[in-house]
Structure formats: structure tokens, C-alpha cells
Amino acid sequence: EGSVSTVPGSYKEFITNDRQIREARKNIWKCIEHIEHLSARTGKKLHLGLEPEPMCYLETTSEAVKFFDQMRKDRKGDLRIDEHLGINYDCCHLAIEYENPHEALGRLVSHKIKISKIHLSSALKVHPTMKVREALKGFSDEVYFHQVIERRVGGEIFRYRDLPDALAANPSNQPHLPEEWRIHFHIPLHHLPTGLFDSTVDHLLGTLDFLKSKPGICSHLEMETYTWEVMPESMKQRSVVDQLVDEYRWTLEQMSRHGLLDKA
């Protein structure tokens, strides 16, 4: 069996009309057809996973469900979509959207959407005080895009394209101060909370809980921390190799605790 993840259609701001979405769906159907032929030729079970990401065309599981519903309407009765297209569930991305892993994964499963792959990943989570905002400057870089989703005290959600945009916002001008920021910065899975920074590793652990309760829904789990070279100096005290070893150990320990090592 083989899986490949890909972008969730496009970046939301790039979409200006329905024609673009129709073309995207047509292209994805072309991918499904190609994967079907490739599967037949190789004798392997192959599938493509669309990976929802903050501020992209598909960024939540609800949006993913609506998209798959439309894909199925385009070609009623064509079951190849169930075999060769699914969702690549990135724990970091869906945690940033404040989704509950049991509800999010349950939503996909109940709509018979394949879980093509799961990215075991964790996002940066903070209460954005002035001290925290100052410390967050160390996470800004010119390599990756770090979207920020802010939850305000009343529950309202506000999005920033990138971390520098969020840091530039003047909190004194905001009528509703933010309660929490979740930042698209993949941090090591074994990272321990500090006085300033926390992580969304609880979403990852909830995902493992779901996999334990629903064995067999996904056999492709992938550690997805890739930001080693752009982390603040305070998180680069040890070599990348040593940190990768620790991340592997942590992941295997958590999978063992959830009884998943023999099922994954």
C-alpha cells in the first residue's frame, strides 16, 4: 500500500470564482484515474491524500466533507474516489483550527472518506501576552509560512496570514483581547511546555486514542516535524539527529501506550 499527500486545492485567497473550483475537481479526478491505472499496473493499493491546512481552500474537516460530497456528485456512482482519494490528516493543522480529534476524524469516517495518512505533528500554542509576543519573534523566519488562528475571549476566531502579521497587530486597538494563538509552526513532538509556550500535542494524543478505538482506519503514520533549522536558538541546543532520536522514542512510546504498534 502507498500514499502520497498533496495540497488542499489552493490557498483560499487565490480562489476568486467557481470555475477555479470546478477545474480543481476535474484535475483531482484525473489524478484518481491515473492512480487507478498505476495501482492496476503495480498490484499495489495506492491513494492520494488532500491535506487540509490553515487558510487554504480546504482547512477544516467540515470543508473537506463538503468538497468530497461535490466530487461524488460530479461522478455519481464512481467508487474510485473511495479507493484512491482521501484526506491526509495533519494533527498540527487541524489543532490550529481548534478541531476536536475524535469529532474531526469521526466526521470523516462517517462520511466514508478515506484517512489516507496521518501526520503526527504538533503546533505552537500560546496565550499572547506582551512578553510572549516578544518571545515569539524568534519563531519568525523567511522560509516557512506560519499562519496564526486567534481565539478571542468571546469565542470569536480571527486569522492572520503569517506570524509577523499577528505580532504587528496592536493589542490596545483590539476590543476583544485574544485568549489563545495557535501558530502553524511544527515543533518537536516531545517538546515540553514552558512558562511562555505550550503545544497542541493533546490533539495528537487524542488522534492516537481515536485510532485505538477504530483499528484499521489508517495504517500510514508519519512524524512531520520539519522546522529544525529555523527553530529559535533556545530550541537548538542539541543536534538535529539527537532530537530526531528523542522524537522517535517519544512517538514509539506513545503508540505503545495506545496499543498501536502492532496495528499501525
Protein language model regions, located:
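Active-site capping/gating regions of soluble enzymes
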Residues: 64-69, 79-210, 216
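Conserved active-site loop/cleft motifs that coordinate metal ions or position small ligands
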Residues: 184, 218-225
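Active-site acidic/histidine proton-transfer and metal-coordination neighborhood
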Residues: 1-86, 96
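Active-site-proximal loop/turn and secondary-structure-junction residues that shape catalytic pockets
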Residues: 8-13, 52-56, 91-95, 122-126, ...
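Well-ordered, non-membrane alpha-helical segments in soluble/globular domains
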Residues: 21-34, 101-104, 200-208, 241-251
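Aromatic-rich peripheral "rim/lid" segments of glycoside hydrolase catalytic domains that contact
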Residues: 227-264
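A structural motif corresponding to the C-terminal end of an alpha-helix
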Residues: 1, 34-46, 79-81, 111, ...
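Short glycine/threonine-rich loop-to-helix capping motif typified by GTGT followed
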Residues: 58-63, 101, 232-240
